[in-house]
Amino acid sequence: MNSFGTRGTLEVGGRQYEIFRLPALKERGMDPARLPYSLRILLENLLRMEDGVTVTAADIEALAGWRPGTVSDREIAFMPGRVLLQDFTGVPAVVDLAAMRDAMSALGGDPRRINPLQPVELVIDHSVQVDAFASAEAFSINEELDYRRNGERYAFLRWGQQAFDNFRVVPPNTGIVHQVNLEYLARVVFTSDENAAAEGPVQAYPDTVVGTDSHTPMVNGLGVLGWGVGGIEAEAAMLGQPVSMLIPDVVGFRLSGALPEGATATDLVLTVTEMLRKKGVVGKFVEFYGPGLASLALADRATIGNMSPEYGATCAIFPVDEVTLRYLRFTGRPEERVALVEAYMKEQGLFHTADSPEPLFSDTIELDLDTVEPSLAGPRRPQDRIRLSEAGVSFRKALPSLLPTRSLTQKEAPTGVAAGPDAVGVWGEGSPDSPSLENGGASGTAGGLTNGSVVIAAITSCTNTSNPSVMLAAGLLAKKAVEKGLTRKPWVKSSLAPGSKVVTRYYEAADLTRYLDELGFQTVGYGCTTCIGNSGPLPTAISQEIQDRDLVAVAALSGNRNFEGRINSDVRANYLMSPPLVVAFALAGRIDINLYEEPLGSGKDGKPVFLRDIWPTRAEIEETVQRAVRSAMFRETYAAVFNGDERWNSMPVPAGVHFAWEPDSTYVRLPPYFEGMTREAPRTVPDVTGARALLLLGDSITTDHISPAGGIKKDSPAGRYLVEKGVGPADFNSYGSRRGNHEVMVRGTFANTRIRNVLAPGTEGGFTTYFPTGEVMTVYDASVRYQADGTPLVVIAGKEYGSGSSRDWAAKGPRLQGVHVAIAESYERIHRSNLVGLGILPLQFMPGENAASIGLTGRETYDVEGASRAIAANFAGGREVTVRARGEGGEKTFRATIRIDTPQEVLYYRHGGILKYVLRQLLSGKEKAEAISGGPATANKNGTTEAVTQNSAQSFPASDSPAY
């Protein structure tokens, strides 16, 4: 359709492209020129996708008429141009697609209809772990272990590559997904002939993306609109379903000035994160503008976009300008692409110049870049920024809250990785066999460890390794440190994990590799590593000392997240910082230090060496960038990015439309999501009655708390399951690598070693009380008993529930444990969407209320009244429900709001989840689901409207309820 007459043509380089011209709307009385850049991208998407059903003329008029201060409940359908995956979320996504093919066949449909209609690119980056370090052999050892542990998963992804159209895989140890996206995959302007499923004339349109990793907005720095979604939402997008959303608020972030001497892009993004968390931008778009844009390199912009989830925004976008074009050329994009980007963006009024009118925004915030100062963030949250000079004071203040709570379980390091230094030579050539550890020694001395000792120093994460300025600053600092005679402290596990092989090339060109090597920062792999918790084990002596003395050890990393329990189970305090500061803290060996006033150590002349003595100047950094970083490095590195090495290509790969599931596999299992599914959706959604609380939690519960990605303990439910299946602890691998096996993942849900459940006082880790007997046991074991009793479950939490990673297993796991309802003070955007997409009802306390103010103990039974009726009426009477909590002290009643936010989400929930909705759509061939009628129903604890099926050792809710 073309209701507004915007279809036109654009000729660039002798080729003609069909486009939908935004300026043409002015002729219809709608002028998008003052809309935020991000909303203009969405507007073009609606114009191009208009079909009168999914996208209507009224949708287009509503978005084109957006103005600050207007509150709209208009739902729009955004169709991303492509989907981006990483392997931890990508494997379960492909597992789900394979299971959908089986279900499609079982229900009489064509399994080939389960096929991506949008281009899908998966980068394997989340699996490699830092087993070996500080050694010339570290990379080869870690790569060997990576293939040994994950070969079955990689073969499964190679099956997916041949079984599905429009699906490409970047092999392991190539780079980090967001850096590869920034440097190579992102087009800025997409053409429809790049989509194998596209038909009709070749169209040109803005590159847009959704990704199964919350840091997908890194590409916003390039002017590409995109954000993170849960795996199931990404699967729906692959299969042609739009992303349903309300027209967002857009917060303008005005930048002025320029970064001062000594401040880095990392310091800037930590400052932005602190400011925007205080501002409150959850679920909103953030858009950067102002005179300060011109002073920021593209890599600096990408760093800011990368941490969008840390400050809660859906995206954090910069407009396309001359800086963008220079970066595209510099990273080796074809000149034809750059010419198309320039011509298209200028034609559409999307190209930013100094003369561009300032857009209108819902709200604004401002930062003078000149005020940014060296910073770090920690010990638990990215928004908790600390001035570098106050690191020691801040740590000592936080220390009481970091001291361990005794767990019921025997203390042990996570298994599934090679244990101790002897296995992999982690101490490296010329390093001590192990540090000398003596009780009572002061941190930062050779005498031993104490609270505040830095035991991990990792240059890691695409947030910073995509930025040549901060990476070369780290190399220059290392060079000066070596020349002064400094060494890293012997208890520090140091590592360098670039997000692209380009980094290695420019380090070599700058002659800095040898200095980093000398300080123990050898390359350990090209992947996420420490940033996502794949830090590997600490040397045995270090780990044992920390555990025996209950020390608060520290990780210093150039990552984007520092949630408790994320980086390493032996580490209780995690600090985010720039790469050069990571090197500095490796030299100091402790966090409780003022680097402005205290020396890093003594030089070879015996004199103290301070940070100021080795910190590189801006002029030194810029000169090194100009000299060492070359465009050819990008072209040559990415020329064969999809090809893989001999190990990748020699892997045996299964073939066929259907995947041949191995019943004994502990990595890839047929999930139970479609068991018992019928072609028709259930008529009603039952209310929940007689529910028990599985957990009562506090604020800032992350998806890492809910579904950890790191090591698996031998005595945990998941560890016991693997042992029963014949897997030794050395081969456990990580939870993240086991996401293709629901049996492992349901057992690992709420198993984070740092989670604290009020219902199991005095414990730390995944414990709860099974109230019928009063026994304290693991969350998983209690969930099995409750499901056997037919008791639905509730999780109660505080503010920012589900913050952090986009992982859908933080919703899948609770659902498979029998959780029907979550009640929280507030939700992070992606997790709330994932809960709905899995059939869990998200309820939100009324403003100013929480579990404590209402007087909930978590020991009550809970009835949710009115949800079935409200959902059946599409919330015509409002979204509020009544919750009755019955306990020994009587009954408490409170109101809560249903957080099913869009009409499309109502359909997902009614169908029992997004995957069933999509499968039924493909079976019926309908563009839109029929309205589902029927009155309210009730599911009681005896399960009168739900069946329970058995799958392996775990009971799962019936497939045709909103659960599964």
Question: Where are these predicted regions, by residue range?
Answer:
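Acidic/polar, glycine-rich intrinsically disordered N-terminal extensions of enzymes
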Residues: 1-79, 121, 656, 660, ...
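Long, structured ligand/cofactor-binding scaffold of large enzymes
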Residues: 51-258, 265-270, 374-377, 396-521, ...
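Terminal amphipathic helices with adjacent charged low-complexity linkers/tails
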Residues: 79, 97-152, 288, 293-420, ...
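Mobile "lid/hinge" segments at catalytic clefts and subdomain interfaces of large enzymes
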Residues: 186, 200-352, 368, 470-493, ...
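Extracellular/luminal Protease-associated
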Residues: 289-296, 560, 783-784, 788-828
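Acidic, glycine-rich flexible loop/linker segments
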Residues: 603-618, 831-908
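Segments forming glycine/polar-rich beta-alpha architectures that bind adenosine-containing cofactors
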Residues: 656-731
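A charge-rich, low-complexity, intrinsically flexible signal that marks solvent-exposed coils, linkers
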Residues: 932-964
